[in-house]
């Protein structure tokens, strides 16, 4: 099986699973809207009332809030990807399901954010490093809620995943960025390393006032919901797999199907 056959096989399987997930759980598309609004409200409250009192310590405490919100969203995505259903019975507990894993990854992001200013006032260098890190660690959210990895292991597993699946993984991400760029959103937001763990959530803020900007943001967030589910399904297909292994399994399945037809 050549590269393009593998690409077609993988994407077709991921798309079919994604459509099935959405058909059975359409509410999942509202995830980025609900959690994005919750995220925005929490950050505004923190920035206005708490950050001025804590100063530099707020850099460690704000990720606590972010980690809890992402934990709940990742828990919902996990239910859909693994079981093709959403359960709200343990909704309150979902805010802690992946909390420690997410915060451990955020901690490293904080350390990196302290190191990068040492490069001085070099915007091009900062952007270049940010893009490289976003590419290498792009699937870190999936490494957490699907791969079950945490702290430095989550980052190292991302690099391993990238070595084997760089093109298959990054092509949908680039397409997603281009679509949002056409919609009027800056592609730079998706290339900021500080937002790498938030990719399945999107980074499109809504205004309290209704307007065309809010309509575009809602459409972008719905698109993000579709993309987040697709990412999860794509990750489950590619993780711990190789093109050779997929070729063997695909050929085995084709032979089995032909045998069944003859019988």
Task: Identify the meaning behind each predicted range.
Residues 1-263:
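Hydrophobic alpha-helical membrane segments
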């Amino acid at each position: 099986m050549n590269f393009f056959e593998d690409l077609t096989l993988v994407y077709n399987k991921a798309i079919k699973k994604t459509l099935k997930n959405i058909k059975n759980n359409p509410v999942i598309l509202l995830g980025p809207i609900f959690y994005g609004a919750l995220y925005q409200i929490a950050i505004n409250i923190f920035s206005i009332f708490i950050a001025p009192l804590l100063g530099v310590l707020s850099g460690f405490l704000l990720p606590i809030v972010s980690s809890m919100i992402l934990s709940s969203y990742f828990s919902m995505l996990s239910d859909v990807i693994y079981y093709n259903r959403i359960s709200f019975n343990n909704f309150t507990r979902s805010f802690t399901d992946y909390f420690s894993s997410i915060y451990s990854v955020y901690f490293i992001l904080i350390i990196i954010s302290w190191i990068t200013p040492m490069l001085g006032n070099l915007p091009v260098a900062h952007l270049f490093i940010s893009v490289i890190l976003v590419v290498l660690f792009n699937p870190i959210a999936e490494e957490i809620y699907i791969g079950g990895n945490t702290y430095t292991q989550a980052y190292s597993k991302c690099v391993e995943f990238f070595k084997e699946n760089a093109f298959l993984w990054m092509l949908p991400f680039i397409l997603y960025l281009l679509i949002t760029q056409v919609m009027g959103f800056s592609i730079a937001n998706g290339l900021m390393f500080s937002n790498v763990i938030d990719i399945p959530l999107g980074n499109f803020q809504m205004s309290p006032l209704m307007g065309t900007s809010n309509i575009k943001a809602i459409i972008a967030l719905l698109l993000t919901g579709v993309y987040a589910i697709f990412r999860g399904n794509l990750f489950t297909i590619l993780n711990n797999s190789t093109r050779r292994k997929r070729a063997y399994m695909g050929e085995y399945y084709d032979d089995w199907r032909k045998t069944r037809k003859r019988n």
